[in-house]
Curated annotation (Swiss-Prot):
Biased composition (Basic residues): 612-623, 673-683
Biased composition regions of type Basic and acidic residues, renumbered to the chain: 370-380, 557-572, 789-802
Gene from which this protein is expressed: Nop17l
Protein name according to UniProt: Protein kintoun
Modification Phosphoserine, positions: 378, 781
Length: 838
């Protein structure tokens, strides 16, 4: 922008046309001026032009030529008067020559009355003429501009005698230059050097139509009367009269110099990345460059400069160069690290001031704010009324979660009760939706307000009430202020608030009020914008954390239900041992309470018990499963017995609490069977016991029984250390072997980062599984093909005699030969992979 302004300035001030010369012409001039004869002829030509007698002959010829064309020409030769020195557009030095000539008309005056004041005075009409501007040089060979304004000699004579007329003559000359050349002159710093005329006087020409037309003009033109024309007005044309200003323009005592402010910025490659804060400081420059044009000053010793963090002040009292500038800067600058330089050739003062940027802490906080606003929504809806299994969480995990939340929660500002909490100049509003849940002596409020600034949370806590306020930032970066006042109900006078915590999340604000130990569980509370606008609200949910000791004691004291059933057809004995369920406990409690209730209540309870007993019997029928005699090694039948549909009666009795046990078949080898089941592999190098699926269907015509296979008792105890081995000598217990699955009470939990989404985490886990599977496939290289064939051969041999390694489990395996072959091949591959790992 500065370069274009300088080009416009040069085009405005330099009116002379540029010399357009080719290289050939330049070489010819160079060769000609190298000859002495040509130089002599050239100097004679210059002397002839500058000779006054020759100038008169030239002017007479031009006058005669123009007269033949019907134009009257007058040459004006300016005579020296006095010179005015000032600045042009605040950048360039200029001179205005006040000259005189007899060809200009005399000034005229007439008596006039001022309409505003009614005073009588003289109304002057001062004719003048102007010449074209020209470039020149001052005493120090610096570029300057020269203008000529020519008056009648009588006007200069009156100016020398009357001070007011002199000032009127100066104002007329300045107005003429500004109006004609569209420039601005510095009227506050006018100087009058001891010069009569600046430069060499150059005549100018005044042309006007002649009063006596020539003979050629008197002859009618053949095309002149084709169209009607307007007749000329009678009388002589009057010259143009420029009205003078009725009120003089007030001249300021000091001039405001011309200045420019440039924003300097370095090229930083970090701004061209895709980071959130890459373009955070693009609009903030590294430094500010202030350039002040002082064309009337020779050095900075003649002015005073004061720079602060937000402004620049320049002051000069030198006669003829009075400047005063007070400039406000757009950014905060470091005034101690700035530097200034004055260009004596251009008369320009340049001040470079580095811009103060934000500290590292503020930039980090701003980065976190941007990351918070640009975080993707996880897509999980939060339901405040959804009940969570609080009773199942142990005390240890609950205390750990409280400790983690207290560490991660942002600190809130606690205000003094004496100062007004809510500002009168800010409009606060109550959250449109909020919920309350009670967990023992903790009241948890969920205020559904998204995008809450953690730093804006402030609270004012009293004994039975709490006042909370916070602010949010919307999509247009416009803050919205909220306030929430909660007070305990008057029904519970012993309740008091010991402490409070407020934490801002993505979609809501969680407020926790910790009550004292003597307080009862509140059923409601009072809430509103402040203490004057309160409304009673009920508590949505009340939860109590059960003690871990009570839960364990109840589990240990739970009775066991043992049932026996004999089958005469297959000589099988079915033993079912299960702990007492919650339904049975409820039945026992109902029986105890029936003695204290009236007869009508007992009838209703009897109907409920009948329904529950029916459901319990259906569940038992679904879960009960019998095992054949081949499932136990100590029972072998030689002759089949006669079929009978009658069953022995079942007996149900209570046993003392004992740990469940499992039996496994010794005749089955783990290497000959495929490991399919719901239990995972325990070790890559140790034995791998297999368990058949507990949920598989059992066919009556199958010749195999479901069992737990292992290679030996010692190997089985390594993998299933938590399940004790059964006593094989006890035939009753061996017949009661039942396949069960035990689950751990420990609940696994997964913690996700705040800035990650569920879809992104799922993609990451899928990629990890693909890489793991690809790595396992690469392990099967060509060099291990021999081991693979040997292992495959041993597996095929075991396939030929399946009856030797398999026992009757009650499943139909005759139609699954293809599946066995595939399983054996997979076992061979796994065995080979384990050998490679060794």
């Amino acid at each position: 922008m500065s370069a274009s302004r300088s080009r416009n300035k040069q085009s405005k001030l330099c009116d002379d046309e540029r010399l357009d010369i080719s290289k050939d012409e330049f070489n010819r001039f160079q060769e000609a001026f190298g000859q002495e004869e040509f130089r002599k002829l050239f100097f004679d030509y210059v002397d002839e032009i500058q000779d006054p007698e020759n100038r008169k002959i030239y002017e007479a010829e031009i006058t005669q030529l123009e007269k033949e064309r019907g134009v009257e020409v007058r040459f004006i030769h300016p005579k020296p008067g006095f010179v005015i020195k000032t600045a042009l557009d605040g950048e360039l030095k200029c001179f205005i020559n006040i000259a005189s000539s007899e060809e200009i008309e005399r000034p005229k005056n007439e008596v006039a009355t001022d309409p505003s004041s009614g005073s009588r005075g003289l109304n002057w009409s001062i004719p003048m003429a102007q010449t074209t501007s020209r470039d020149d040089f001052d005493a120090k060979n610096n570029h300057c501009k020269v203008f000529d304004v020519v008056f009648h000699p009588d006007a200069l004579h009156l100016a020398m005698r009357n001070k007011q007329f002199r000032q009127c003559l100066i104002d007329t000359a300045l107005d003429a230059v500004e109006r004609e050349y569209k420039v601005s002159l510095d009227r506050a710093n006018l100087k009058f050097p001891k010069l009569d005329y600046k430069g060499i006087p150059r005549p100018t020409v005044i042309r006007k139509m002649s009063d006596n037309p020539t003979a050629e003009e008197q002859e009618p033109h053949p095309l002149a009367h084709m169209f009607p024309t307007k007749p000329p007005a009678p009388g002589k044309p009057e010259p143009r009269v420029l009205p003078m200003k009725t009120k003089p323009t007030p001249v300021p005592e000091f001039t405001v110099p011309r200045y420019t402010i440039k924003h300097s910025h370095d090229v930083d490659l970090s701004e061209y990345t895709d980071e959130l804060d890459a373009k955070l400081h693009v609009t903030v420059p590294r430094s500010l460059v202030v350039e002040i044009e002082l064309p009337l000053l020779r050095s900075t010793a003649e002015c005073q400069l004061d720079v602060t963090s937000k402004s620049v002040y320049l002051f000069s009292e030198r006669q003829g160069a009075k400047y005063r500038l007070k400039l406000d800067l757009p950014f905060i600058v470091d005034d101690k690290a700035g530097r200034a330089r004055f260009d004596t050739d251009m008369r320009r003062l340049s001040i470079t001031l580095p811009v103060v940027r934000k500290s590292v802490q503020e930039q980090a906080q701003m980065h976190e704010t941007l990351r918070h606003f640009s975080r993707e929504d996880s897509g999980v809806e939060l339901h405040s009324n959804s009940e969570s299994p609080v009773e199942e969480d142990p005390d240890g995990e609950l205390s750990d979660s409280k400790a983690d939340i207290s560490k991660t929660s942002s600190p809130t500002v606690v205000r003094n009760a004496n100062s007004p909490f809510l500002k009168s100049s800010v409009h606060y509003q109550l959250p449109s939706k909020f919920d309350c849940n009670v967990l023992d002596n903790v009241m948890a409020f969920v205020l559904h307000v998204p995008n809450v600034q953690p730093d804006s949370i402030e609270q004012l806590r009293e004994q039975r009430s709490l006042h909370l306020k916070f602010a949010t930032i919307g999509s247009g970066y416009y803050p919205t202020h909220y306030a929430f006042y909660v007070e305990l109900s008057a029904d519970h006078e012993d309740s008091a608030i010991e402490s409070a915590e407020a934490e801002a999340w993505d979609n809501n604000v969680v407020l926790k009020l910790y009550l004292n130990s003597q307080s009862e569980t509140p059923a409601g509370y009072l809430a509103g914008l402040d203490a004057t606008e309160l409304k009673e609200y009920p508590v949505h949910g009340q939860y109590h954390v059960k003690s871990k000791e009570k839960v364990n004691a109840k589990k240990e004291n739970a009775p066991l239900d043992v049932e026996f059933e004999r089958n005469q057809e297959g000589h099988a004995l079915k033993v079912t041992i299960r702990p007492g369920t919650k339904e049975e406990e409820e039945e026992e409690e109902d029986k105890e309470n029936q003695d204290q209730k009236p007869e009508s209540d007992q009838q209703q309870q009897q109907q409920v018990q009948n329904k529950k007993s029916g459901k319990k019997q259906r569940k038992r029928n679904k879960k009960e499963r019998s095992l054949s005699e081949s499932a136990c090694a100590d029972m072998v039948l030689q002759e089949p017995l006669a079929k009978s549909n009658e069953l022995q009666p079942r007996a149900t009795f209570k046993l003392p609490p004992q740990r469940k046990q499992r039996s496994y078949s010794e005749s089955n080898d783990s290497t000959g069977r495929s490991h399919r089941g719901i239990l995972k592999r325990f070790s890559r190098y140790g034995p791998r016991p297999s368990m058949s699926d507990s949920c598989s269907s059992i066919d009556d015509s199958s010749s195999y029984s479901c069992s737990v296979d292992a290679s030996g008792a010692s190997l089985f105890s390594q993998s299933f250390g938590g399940i004790p081995e059964e006593d094989r000598s006890d035939a009753g217990l061996s017949e009661s072997c039942k396949k069960t699955v035990r689950f751990n009470d420990h609940i696994m939990k997964q913690v996700f980062r705040l800035d990650s989404s569920i879809l992104g985490q799922r993609k990451k886990n899928q990629k990890r599984r693909d890489l793991k599977l690809r790595a396992q496939q690469r392990r099967l290289s060509e060099g291990d093909s021999v081991d693979y064939e040997e292992t495959r051969g041993s597996a095929l041999k075991q396939k030929e005699n399946p009856s030797r390694n398999c026992t009757d489990s009650g499943l139909d395996l005759t139609g699954a030969a293809g599946a066995h072959s595939n399983n054996n091949e997979s076992d061979a591959k796994n065995a080979m992979m384990f050998e490679m790992d060794d």
